[in-house]
Amino acid sequence: MRNDMNRRDLLKLAGMGVAVFVSGTALSAGEVRRRETESFYFVQLSDTHWGFNGPNINPDSQGTLKKAVAAVNALDKQPEFVVFTGDLTQTTDDRKVRRDRMAEFRDIVSQLKVRTVRFMPGEHDASLDRGEAYQEFFGDLHYTFDHKGIHFVVLDNVSDPTASVGEQQLHWLQADLKAIKNDSRIVVLTHRPLFDLAPDWDWATRDGAAVIDTLMQHRNVTVLYGHIHQEHHHMTGHIAHHAAKSTMWALPEPGSVPKKAQIPWNPAEPYKGLGFRNVEAEVARATYKIEEFPVGKAQ
């Protein structure tokens, strides 16, 4: 069986343009009855790169994040929370500019009409200063939270310049997961892929295999991540990994070109490849429905 699933395959499964992913095993009838009213959905945005300037790549670089915020606010039903999976800002060596960009980003996303907005860093936010500026604006680099029966784990695989989670954080993860049942629903939020998608393109986590080995001990695990600026779906054993699009620029499919490079802006198809997603957590059926939304006038 293939580990990778393309968009056409997913649409065949979903039928109506909403991809449905089964995560782990179904819950018991008693557990279903207990939680049947607790299904919910949230929004994932990623790789907003506030501060990027490149008219050949995105002539609307000052507008796409604002368009994404407006699109989320215009959804028929507001999500219970929004999560940004890293690269909130464009990297810079200037300490002041770095903080200015983070402040501007924070001001823009404060316009989201949701109760809770959660953040995590990307390498553009945290690798140059090991997350010092990021923590001033957004808090912890890694943490957990629980929502309606699902345990969310936010992992930092970017503040270490070697693209590692690190021994200390791995021990923290192992201790955290020991405190919950093996059949608990777990969603891991991270920036880089935990598996070796394309290591020569920096699409991997150096010690990701150790993280996956830890997660494999639990039956219901799903990973949502960013970094690769495109929708991508992969399985490691029973663990599903789903990458999100960027709101700033698209990147080519892994291995499709000799060298990774930003896809130039096409005036005939503005905003193509840019977007965000809704994730509906269906607790009773142990599934996640992922629906992709465009930014701007995407084709």
Q: What residue spans do the PLM features occupy?
A:
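N-terminal secretory signal peptides and thylakoid transit peptides that target proteins
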Residues: 1-21
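N-terminal active-site segment of His-dependent metallophosphoesterases
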Residues: 13-14, 29-99, 175, 182, ...
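Extended active-site neighborhood of metal-dependent phosphoesterases/phosphodiesterases
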Residues: 34, 93-185, 203-222, 228, ...
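Active-site glycine-centered loops adjacent to acidic/histidine catalytic or metal-binding residues
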Residues: 47, 86-87, 122-123, 191, ...
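Short active-site segment of divalent metal-dependent hydrolases/proteases
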Residues: 50, 90, 125, 194, ...
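Short acidic, glycine-rich surface-loop motifs adjacent to enzyme active sites
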Residues: 181-197
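C-terminal/domain-terminus segments
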Residues: 290-299
